[in-house]
From Swiss-Prot:
CDD domains: beta-trefoil_IL18. Keywords: Cytokine, Cytoplasm, Inflammatory response, Secreted. It comes from the Eukaryota. Forms a ternary complex with ligand-binding receptor subunit IL18R1 and signaling receptor subunit IL18RAP at the plasma membrane. Mature IL18 first binds to IL18R1 forming a low affinity binary complex, which then interacts with IL18RAP to form a high affinity ternary complex that signals inside the cell. Interacts with cargo receptor TMED10; the interaction mediates the translocation from the cytoplasm into the ERGIC (endoplasmic reticulum-Golgi intermediate compartment) and thereby secretion. One of its GO terms (cellular component) is extracellular space. It is found in: Cytoplasm, Cytosol; Secreted. This is Interleukin-18. It comes from Canis lupus familiaris (Dog). Pro-inflammatory cytokine primarily involved in epithelial barrier repair, polarized T-helper 1 (Th1) cell and natural killer (NK) cell immune responses. Upon binding to IL18R1 and IL18RAP, forms a signaling ternary complex which activates NF-kappa-B, triggering synthesis of inflammatory mediators. Synergizes with IL12/interleukin-12 to induce IFNG synthesis from T-helper 1 (Th1) cells and natural killer (NK) cells.
Amino acid sequence: MAANLIEDNCINLVKMKFVNNTLYFKAESDEGLESDYFGKLEPKLSIIRNLNDQVLFVNEGNQPVFEDMPDSDCTDNAPHTIFIIYMYKDSLTRGLAVTISVKYKTMSTLSCKNKTISFQKMSPPDSINDEGNDIIFFQRSVPGHDDKIQFESSLYKGHFLACKKENDLFKLILKDKDENGDKSIMFTVQNKS
């Protein structure tokens, strides 16, 4: 039994050129080519916890910290604990592209600009025409852990959202993944209906 050929999904190249140690190709036709971009899809309302079961909470200073909190307190503090995770269609296949926002008085979106984690007063845009952006993270399952998630920065490859204890606070930070099984970069995401 012969396999059926799938629709021709190839690009015919007609020219190659080296410029500053980068090889460029010229396609016979631009038809069907897309630019790299992220396009916003439907959001999910979620509670994010670290592996110590502490809840991600946006404090009055608009800073993301983890706190011990029973489920009833999560409901009572919903504007600070319920995150709006917008999923984005990604023109490349690198994981589920997401933004993480919270709406308390105004909409704020998580940013890792200059490798510093903060909430910026902004709504996530409908589309982002970049390959990497400070507000886009790739949400991925953790191999060997069915219910664990990690968030990799699209702007800083190999850098992940993580929980770190500083003084008496557990803060959300961006860190370079330094070892296999690093539990500080693992989270559980509980979607609300």
